[in-house]
Amino acid sequence: MADQVSPDQGLVIELGAGTGNVTQALLDAGLSPDHLIVVERDPAFYVLLKQRFPFLKILRGDAARLRRVLAPLGISSAVAVVSSLPLLSMPKPIRQRIVEESFAVLAERGTFIQYTYGAFSPLRRRQSGLKGEVAERVWRNFPPAAVWRFRRRGSAAHVA
């Protein structure tokens, strides 16, 4: 999943970091801590992330209210949103709100990257005006996992 983000392109927002495995992979891939903001809703994971990554900007908040969560930092644009949220298990209105909030903070040519299980897209691409593709499959997982990359239709990639 970290391979989908180019470390020198700009600000990356991670949603639902949990214990920080993807966070660590992003840092290991060369993403500067100054270019990563982590948003975590769960209080226990938030505390764990603050302890594990004291040098990162970690915000406690709901991805469905992403603009409000980022507002105190004055952040209004990112080149990528990386999500490990279980979108497929969420009610459609919440899933839709998270995607809308993510694209509201993405630069015009920004990318929404979603890790998910199963063979199907976690987002309805045609209805949402997005172009989606499987960027990577992880066959070692059971069930197999997929990394999906979504952009607005007609935009080129800013991330690898």
Annotate each language-model stretch with its function.
Residues 42, 62:
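Conserved SAM/SAH-binding beta-strand->alpha-helix loop
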Residues 49-50:
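Conserved SAM-binding loop
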Residues 9-18:
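Conserved class I S-adenosyl-L-methionine
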